[in-house]
Regions:
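Glycine-rich phosphate-binding loops that contact phosphosugars or nucleotide phosphates
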Residues: 1-138, 144-151
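Alpha-helical structural motif
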Residues: 51, 139, 169-173
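Internal, active-site/partner-interface "lid" segment
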Residues: 145-179
Length: 180
């Protein structure tokens, strides 16, 4: 379960949506919790990141428990919505991963595993879609790739369970099969 607000949510989605076609990850084992909901992907939903009541309700509705892994992303490390989801998920015994670009981020309190991406100040002050966003994307790529390698979905550096959903990927799958 990827959790975030704004740019962090969008970056989580970038990583998560590729798990099925790249690694044949079961679609029913992938969830996104986005401050402001799905509409927040295309435009800003004001005050969504501050709505901790909604965060609590979503955790309860999704029945997040010990069988879940919840990855919370927050460039500031202090996004109330994301912190609350991770706090409640941890309370429900889910495995929690807190990713913060701020070494003093509150979200780190709720992570069983804490990842600090200390990108410091942005070139354009306050614009977390730059260095912070890039670092989050790289971090998620590393995490998801490591998990898929450990699960046997990569063999000799080749994604052996890729789903060929178009012409380009069908050709790639033939090439992969010839190498395995």
């Amino acid at each position: 379960i990827y959790v975030g607000a704004g740019t962090s949510a969008r970056i989580g989605i970038q990583d998560g949506v590729e798990l099925f076609p790249t690694f044949n990850w079961p679609k029913n084992r992938l969830e996104f919790i986005i401050a402001g909901g799905i509409q927040a992907l295309l435009k800003a939903v004001e005050n969504a990141e501050d709505n901790i009541n909604l965060a609590e309700n979503i955790v309860a509705e999704k029945l997040i428990c010990h069988e879940d892994v919840v990855i919370g992303l927050a460039a500031s490390g202090n996004t109330p919505f994301t912190c609350k989801v991770l706090e409640k998920a941890k309370f429900n015994n889910a495995l929690t991963i807190a990713i913060s670009n701020n070494p003093k981020g509150k979200i780190l309190e709720y992570g069983d595993h804490k990842i600090i991406l200390n990108t410091k100040e942005e070139v354009i002050a306050g614009s977390t879609r730059l260095k912070a966003g890039t670092a989050q994307k790289i971090c998620l790529n590393i995490i998801s790739s490591m998990v898929m390698v450990k699960m046997g979905k990569v063999k000799n550096g080749i994604m052996n369970e890729m789903i060929p959903t178009n012409k380009k990927l069908r050709l790639r799958k033939k090439l992969i099969n010839s190498k395995i």
